[in-house]
C-alpha cells in the first residue's frame, strides 16, 4: 500500500487573523492617546483664542509688537532655511557620493544639534560673541551686532535646524548611488549640469520634505532664540517668545492668538508633508509599473 508522499502545508497564522478584540483595543488606545496628547490641547488653544470673539483675536494679532514678532519670525525662517538648504545639499552630496577622511566625523557633527539642548546652543553663541570675548570686542569696535539682534537669531536658528535637510537627503542619495552621475559625466555633462538635470530630480521629494521640517522647526524654535534675543520688545522677539511674554502678562487672548497662528503653520506643514508623501508614493508606483 503506497503512502501519499504529499505533505499538506500547515496554515500559518497571519497577523491579520488575530483576535478582533486585540486589534480594536490597539486602535482605540492609539486614538485615545492622540486625542488626549494632541487633539484636545490643540483644540483648547483655538477655543481660548476665540473665547472673546473674532474681534479681540484680530486685534491681538494686529498689535504692533505682535506684528513685529510675526514679521521677524518670517524673516529669520526665510533666511535660515535657504542657507540650511544649501548646506544640507552640499553635505549630503559629499557624504553620499564621495569617500574621504573624516566622513564619519562630519556625519556625527551633522547630528550634534539633535543631541544638544537648544538652550546650550544659544549659550554657545553668547560665549562666542559676548561682549567680554575677544571676538565680541572686535565686533563692538566695528559696530557689528550679533547678539540681541537679528543676526544672532538667524545663527541660533540655523544651528538648531541645519540637520533636517541633510538627514533627509543622505540615506536617499546613498541608496541611489553614483551610477547616474557617472553616466552623465561620461557623456560630457558638467558638474552643474549633472546636479541640475540628474541629481536634483532624483532627490526633489526628499529635499522638499527636509525643507518643510526645517521651516517648521525654525518658526517654532524657542530655547536657542530665547538665549540670544535679549527679549527686546518689537525688535528681537519671535512668535514663540511673544507667546511667552503675553502669557506671563496674563494677556491670554493675545498669547493664544499667536499660538493659534503657530498651530496653523504647523497644520499647513503637516498637510504639505502628507501631500508630498502621497505624490512621492504615486511617482514610485508609476515608475515600477513601467
Predicted regions and their residues:
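Transmembrane-helix boundary motif in ABC transporter permease subunits
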Residues: 17-18, 60, 79-110, 123-127, ...
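Periplasmic/extracellular loop-to-transmembrane helix junction in inner-membrane transport proteins
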Residues: 9-21, 45-82, 97-98, 245-253
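Membrane-interfacial helix termini and adjacent extracytoplasmic/periplasmic loops
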Residues: 10-16, 54-62, 67, 102-103, ...
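Transmembrane alpha-helices
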Residues: 29, 82, 112, 159-177, ...
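N-terminal signal-anchor/first transmembrane alpha helix
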Residues: 12-44
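Hydrophobic alpha-helical transmembrane segments of multipass integral membrane proteins
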Residues: 36, 71, 75-87, 91, ...
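C-terminal transmembrane helix and the adjacent membrane-cytosol boundary/short C-terminal tail
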Residues: 3-4, 25-29, 40, 44, ...
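Interhelical loop and adjacent transmembrane-helix boundary motif
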Residues: 19-20, 57, 64, 222-272
Amino acid at each position: 500500500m503506497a503512502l501519499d508522499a504529499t505533505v499538506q502545508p500547515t496554515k500559518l497564522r497571519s497577523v491579520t487573523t488575530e483576535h478582533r478584540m486585540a486589534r480594536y483595543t490597539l486602535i482605540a488606545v492609539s486614538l485615545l492617546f492622540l486625542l488626549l496628547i494632541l487633539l484636545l490641547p490643540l483644540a483648547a488653544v483655538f477655543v481660548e483664542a476665540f473665547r472673546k470673539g473674532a474681534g479681540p483675536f484680530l486685534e491681538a494679532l494686529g498689535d504692533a509688537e505682535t506684528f513685529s514678532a510675526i514679521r521677524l519670525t518670517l524673516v529669520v525662517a526665510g533666511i535660515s532655511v535657504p542657507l540650511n538648504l544649501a548646506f544640507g545639499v552640499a553635505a549630503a552630496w559629499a557624504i553620499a557620493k564621495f569617500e574621504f577622511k573624516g566622513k564619519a566625523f562630519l556625519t556625527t557633527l551633522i547630528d550634534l544639534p539633535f543631541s544638544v539642548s537648544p538652550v546650550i546652543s544659544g549659550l554657545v553663541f553668547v560665549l562666542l560673541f559676548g561682549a567680554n570675548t575677544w571676538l565680541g570686542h572686535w565686533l563692538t569696535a566695528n559696530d557689528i551686532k550679533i547678539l540681541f539682534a537679528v543676526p544672532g537669531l538667524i545663527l541660533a536658528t540655523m544651528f538648531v535646524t541645519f540637520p533636517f535637510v541633510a538627514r533627509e537627503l543622505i540615506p536617499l542619495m546613498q541608496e541611489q548611488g553614483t551610477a547616474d552621475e557617472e553616466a552623465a559625466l561620461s557623456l560630457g555633462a558638467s558638474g552643474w549640469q549633472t546636479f541640475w538635470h540628474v541629481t536634483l530630480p532624483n532627490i526633489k521629494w526628499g529635499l522638499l520634505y527636509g525643507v518643510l521640517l526645517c521651516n517648521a522647526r525654525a518658526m517654532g524654535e524657542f530655547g536657542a532664540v530665547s538665549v540670544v534675543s535679549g527679549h527686546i520688545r518689537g525688535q528681537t522677539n519671535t512668535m514663540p517668545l511673544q507667546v511667552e511674554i503675553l502669557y506671563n502678562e496674563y494677556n491670554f487672548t493675545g498669547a493664544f492668538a499667536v499660538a493659534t497662528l503657530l498651530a496653523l503653520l504647523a497644520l499647513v506643514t503637516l498637510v504639505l508633508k502628507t501631500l508630498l508623501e502621497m505624490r512621492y508614493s504615486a511617482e514610485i508606483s508609476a515608475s515600477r509599473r513601467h
